[in-house]
Amino acid sequence: MHSNNNIHIISIGGSVMHDLAINLKKNGNVVTGSDDKIYEPSKSNLKKNNLYPKKLGYHKENITKNLDFVITGMHTKSDNIELQTAKKNRIPIYSYPEFIRKSSDNKHRIVIAGSHGKTTVTSIIMHVLKKNKIKFDYVIGGRANGFNSNIKI
């Protein structure tokens, strides 16, 4: 699921979604995306990685039959024209959490939950794994020092 796919991300401008798009592209996928508003630093990061949408907004022509699947961001509404077009064309659709779960189906998971300290604890675990040269994927709510992204899958 991680390489050689044609993927469209609806609501690509979010902090997590744009990092996901960049990560998927670096893994060898063809990635496109759409959003109605994109702010910094997402805007610069998407442009730097040639992932910034050609025009802002949601357009049914963004959903082509050669897509392997579509990933939706948390702000994607059920009446979104791209989402409706993907459904009509029977293109598999994953929400962000569904995609992360599917991406980690065959992996050991460490999940940090709670009200406070999740990013800090996750960051500590990431640094321990990195220091011990253990390969790992991660999804973290904020930026951890020494890591360029909040997601690597």
What is each of the regions a protein language model found here?
Residues M1-P41, N45-P53, N66-V70, A86-I91:
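ATP-dependent carboxylate-amine ligase
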Residues S11-V16, G33, G57, G114-G117, ...:
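Glycine-centered flexibility sites
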Residues P53-Y58, Y94:
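Short acidic-hydrophobic, aromatic-tinged amphipathic segments that line or gate anion-handling sites
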Residues N4, N23-K26, K47, E61-K65, ...:
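Phosphate-binding loop of NTP-binding sites
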